């Protein structure tokens, strides 16, 4: 009977020891993940501040962040800051695909601050690609989500400028169509021998 009690106590001690070690490992892992994400968040905030001044440095800082154990938010912020830095360096192909990845996450989280950035960046991409209708659409969305992130005077200038260009393009297309129809009717008259 005593041997059975000693054996039960020994098993119970092993279970407690295993549970304590498990809790210790889990707490160290959680603390490590917290520190990694906190460090990444501060580096991302620093890099985000550098986008306007030195986009190459911002891009280099984002590239140095190890993304293995990042939270979903920090991972998406890495892509957003990277897209902003690339747009600052006037490279427009890669940021568009990065923004396609990031946009649904911030829409789901209803994060108007970052949605403003996304629409501003998309407007910049469309503006430099001469897609004026898309630029107007994205800058309009940017003004709707804007929480004093961007100067509304600049956005309104872009909007009015692009709306004017779109109107001018549509008006020119109408004149071109009329000129084409006039040329076709003149050609038909010249071909008609009567």
Give the predicted meaning of each segment.
Residues 1-21, 28-194:
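A "functional boundary" signal
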């Amino acid at each position: 009977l005593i041997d059975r009690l000693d054996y039960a106590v020994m098993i119970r001690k092993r279970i407690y020891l295993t549970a304590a070690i498990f809790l210790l490992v889990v707490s160290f892992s959680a603390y490590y993940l917290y520190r990694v994400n906190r460090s990444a968040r501060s580096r991302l905030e620093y890099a985000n501040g550098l986008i306007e001044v030195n986009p190459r440095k911002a891009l280099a800082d984002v590239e140095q962040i190890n993304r293995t154990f990042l939270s979903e938010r920090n991972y998406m912020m890495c892509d957003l800051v990277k897209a902003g830095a690339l747009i600052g360096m006037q490279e427009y192909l890669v940021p568009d695909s990065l923004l396609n990845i990031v946009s649904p996450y911030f829409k789901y989280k209803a994060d108007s601050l970052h949605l403003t950035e996304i629409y501003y960046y998309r407007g910049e991409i469309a503006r430099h690609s001469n897609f004026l209708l898309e630029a107007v659409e994205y800058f309009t969305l940017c003004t709707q989500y804007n929480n004093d992130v961007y100067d509304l005077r600049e956005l309104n200038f872009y909007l009015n400028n692009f709306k004017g260009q779109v109107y001018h393009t549509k008006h020119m297309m109408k004149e071109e169509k009329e000129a084409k129809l006039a040329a076709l009717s003149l050609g038909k008259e010249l071909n008609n021998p009567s």
